[in-house]
Design a protein with these regions (language model features):
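Transmembrane beta-barrel wall of Gram-negative outer-membrane proteins
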Residues: 6-35, 40-78, 101-122, 170, ...
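Face-selective signature of the C-terminal outer-membrane beta-barrel domain
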Residues: 63-69, 103-250, 270-272, 327, ...
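C-terminal beta-barrel architecture of Gram-negative outer-membrane proteins
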Residues: 32, 37, 302, 389-391, ...
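Membrane-embedded beta-barrel scaffold of Gram-negative outer-membrane proteins
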Residues: 15, 20, 113, 122-140, ...
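C-terminal beta-signal and adjacent terminal beta-strands/loops
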Residues: 338, 432-433, 455-515
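Surface-exposed extracellular loop regions of Gram-negative outer-membrane beta-barrel proteins
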Residues: 74-91, 189-198, 242-249, 257, ...
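Gram-negative outer-membrane beta-barrel transporters
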Residues: 167-170, 334-343, 356-437, 510-514
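Transmembrane beta-strands of outer-membrane beta-barrel pores
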Residues: 4-10, 22, 33-37, 59, ...
Length: 515
């Protein structure tokens, strides 16, 4: 196939993809070239090249594939801007403070997968190696720290990840009941070189820190599904994860080694179906990992003040109860309520562009998802969710989690198999969010409406028009609240909402031919 797209704001896209028989198997290939400026005063000039090449051979009973993927891009970044500068007319919504922000990225990967299945067993092995290299330039506080050169900083990162996954599943019986058991192992090794540099117009001024990091993780798991009765089954699992961190920093005090391990049990109880309806209860434990550098840190590399270390792995516990039903013809619905606790919440720092380990947190929520296909040519997806997110400890600053979305909803309709016509329309809503812990500053809600309509000119040729932000909403994609300083302000700057707008209304045209 060949696909060519053009649109407003410098949008250009070309895609070539296909597959053919080769050496007893199948060779798949694809190449994408992409450019977009966006609606910003200084265009993003986002250039991207994507390529994939995959050779596969075998059947469902056994086979393998080898895949190579390459991705490279470069862009200008219009980062979040202070609301006060838009309110007083200094900037428009699509302006920037530091026009030299941006970055370059590349990602190359090579992977292989093998599987072998019999009537009662299934074995899978896959491995991959990925090299990521990026260099990002950002300036979120403008002139707060350095009134002469500005606060731009660079985050160079070069990492190679190597991973091996293997699993074996078999059917059998447990206490005379039909049962399936899976055992598996996952091994990952990351070699990372990164840093934090002070820059001006992408030129290095000084070095805050440089680090060489080696992170090794091993996870082993066992999962069993047993059908105890016609309408009752369980899924029981246990996983053990071990992480080893080694950091060699340009600041000797921040070098070191540490390790951590956690066991994560999980249990699911599934009842039914009755009248095409199932009920389920899930409970379990998991974790998130922290930045390896934080596990051995001793001093703040920027201020020189003593710094607290963070645990390598942070415990998470959760439970969920739900119902899945198809009792209404052509409608699949799921309703669930859940609770999720973290021993330490990962908080994104809008003024630094980094995450930090925060206070213990809890989320309690409800989700309702629906997939409805009233006719062969119309599909409707409707989802709504609400979550109450709070810190669990007591602190005078407040209990709200900055940036935690409280309510989200989406409604989408797609049309196909309606003669030569096809299309889709999607509405999405993200509710207001607290921006600081005491909830005194909140973002507004974000609403988008996107759509597309197409016509099949012939059996192998189609044309499609896409529209983005059809209501031309002035919503924000992100909002943060922190201190920054503009050139005409005092040394302490001001606390303010900083936002990045969603893109303005735009249209694109795509022509696709299949051979």
């Amino acid at each position: 196939m060949v696909s060519l797209g053009v649109g407003e704001n410098g949008y250009r896209r070309g895609l070539v993809a296909g597959s053919s028989a080769a050496v007893g198997g199948n060779l798949l290939y694809a190449l994408e070239i992409f450019h977009n400026d966006g609606p910003f005063s200084k265009g993003d000039n986002y250039r991207k090249i994507n390529g994939v090449l995959r050779y596969s051979r075998g059947t469902e009973a056994g086979g393998f594939n080898i895949t190579a993927i390459a991705y490279t891009s470069a862009y200008n970044a219009t980062d979040q801007i202070p609301k006060r500068a838009v309110d007083d007319g200094t900037l428009n919504r699509f302006s920037s403070i530091d026009s030299t922000d941006g970055g370059k990225v590349h990602r190359y990967s090579l992977s292989a997968a093998w599987h072998q299945n019999t009537e009662n067993t299934a074995t899978k092995v896959n491995a991959y190696i990925i090299n990521n290299r990026l260099r990002i330039y950002s300036n979120f506080t403008y002139f707060l720290d350095d009134p002469v050169n500005g606060d731009q900083f660079a985050q160079p990162d070069n990492r190679t990840d190597m991973t091996l996954n293997a699993s074996h599943a078999w059917k059998g019986s447990l206490f005379g009941r039909l049962s399936e058991t899976t055992v598996g192992i996952q091994i990952q090794r990351d070699a990372i070189r990164n840093g934090l540099l002070s820059t001006k117009a992408r030129q290095e001024l000084s070095e805050t820190r440089r680090d060489r990091i080696k992170e090794t993780s091993v996870g082993a798991y066992l999962e069993n599904t047993t059908h105890w009765a016609e309408k009752f089954r369980t899924v029981v699992g246990i996983r053990e994860d071990y992480y080893k961190f080694a950091v060699h920093s340009s600041l000797d005090a921040n070098s070191g080694r540490t390790h951590a391990s956690l066991a994560s049990p999980k249990l699911s109880l599934i009842f039914g179906p009755w009248a095409k309806t199932e009920f389920y209860l899930n409970a379990g434990a998991g974790f998130h990992s922290n930045d390896a550098r934080g596990t051995v840190i001793a001093i703040d590399p920027k201020s020189g003040d003593p710094a607290d270390r963070v645990p390598g792995l942070v415990r998470a516990k959760g439970a969920e109860a739900g119902i899945r039903t198809e009792i209404i013809p052509r409608l699949q619905s799921t309703l669930s309520v859940y609770g999720l606790d973290f021993a330490s919440e990962l908080i994104f720092q809008g003024d630094a562009g980094t995450t930090s380990a925060g206070r213990p947190s809890r989320r309690v929520g409800i989700e309702f998802s629906n997939y409805y296909k009233p006719t062969d040519w119309l599909t409707i997806d409707a989802d709504i969710a609400y979550a109450k997110a709070r810190f669990r400890d007591v602190d005078p600053v407040g209990r709200r989690i900055p940036g935690a979305v409280e309510g989200v909803a989406s409604l989408a309709a797609s049309v196909d198999n309606l003669g030569p016509y096809f299309g889709a329309l999607q509405f999405r809503y993200f509710g207001p969010r607290p921006l600081i812990e005491d909830n005194s500053v909140r973002s507004k809600s974000t609403t988008t409406l996107n759509g597309r309509a197409g016509y099949k000119v012939g059996p192998n040729v189609s044309v499609e028009v896409e529209g983005f932000n059809l209501l031309n909403s002035k919503s924000s994609a992100i909002d943060y609240y922190y201190q920054s300083r503009l050139p005409n302000e005092g040394p302490n700057g001001e606390n303010d909402i900083h936002f990045h707008p969603i893109e303005s209304r735009s249209a694109r045209l795509t022509l696709t031919a299949r051979f």
